[in-house]
Regions:
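Multi-pass membrane proteins that catalyze or facilitate reactions on polyprenyl-/lipid-phosphate substrates
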Residues: 1-205
Length: 205
């Protein structure tokens, strides 16, 4: 994680940050336009279970489908590829779809090596999560202004979001490290098993 942060804050590579911004734009647009619909889908355990199952099946074949990777670093990454990866990332707005997996698959589809696709996915998570948190806070403020204006609530929100952000970043880094070493198959089997178990639980009431 420390190594990734050093790369992230290497301000000598300004073009890298512009490419990250380009990659975040699709999520910002779709998140703004369809946030209410996404919240509705989150309330459906059947949608989550189904996407976990179907997504797991897709992951079993990813390493075989996307081959001949030629993009090894951000200097070889075009803005078009960054935006396309960002579009893939928006699939994570569907409940049950992994953001990291979606963006890594998008990277591999755009000829990134699995290692660089994982690295770019990690970097892309930072502005994406910050933007999502900021939007939710703004939405909460519009609905209930006292949430933000109260000092006690503001401190609680700040601590809660900071802890959630740190835990999410660590979890993403672990997940990406796992994918770099083992590929998508094991994660695919896990999602299939979890999806089947959830569907059985839903069916049995």
């Amino acid at each position: 994680v420390v190594l990734y942060w050093r790369k992230f804050f290497d301000f000598k590579r300004l073009e890298f940050y512009f490419k990250l911004i380009a990659g975040v734009i699709p999520a910002l647009l779709l998140g703004y336009l369809f946030s209410d619909k996404i919240d509705e889908l989150l309330e459906s355990p059947t949608v989550v279970a189904t996407t976990m199952l179907l997504g797991g099946i897709v992951l079993l074949f990813i390493d075989k489908v996307f081959k001949n990777h030629t993009v090894e670093n951000d200097r070889q990454l075009s803005y078009g590829k960054a935006i396309t990866i960002g579009i893939w990332q928006t699939l994570a707005m569907i409940p049950g779809v992994s953001r990291s997996a979606a963006s890594i698959i998008g990277g591999m589809q755009q000829k990134l090596t699995r290692s660089f696709a994982a690295e770019f996915s990690f970097f892309l998570a930072v502005p994406t999560m910050m933007a999502a948190t900021g939007y939710k806070l703004l939405k909460a403020y519009k609905e209930t202004p006292e949430i933000i204006t109260s000092k006690q609530n503001l401190i609680a929100l700040g601590i809660g979001n900071l802890v959630a952000f740190i835990v999410a970043i660590l979890a993403i880094r672990f997940f990406i490290g796992f994918l770099q070493k083992h590929g998508f198959k094991l994660f695919g089997y896990y999602r299939i098993a979890a999806g089947i178990i959830l569907l059985i639980m839903i069916a049995s009431g």
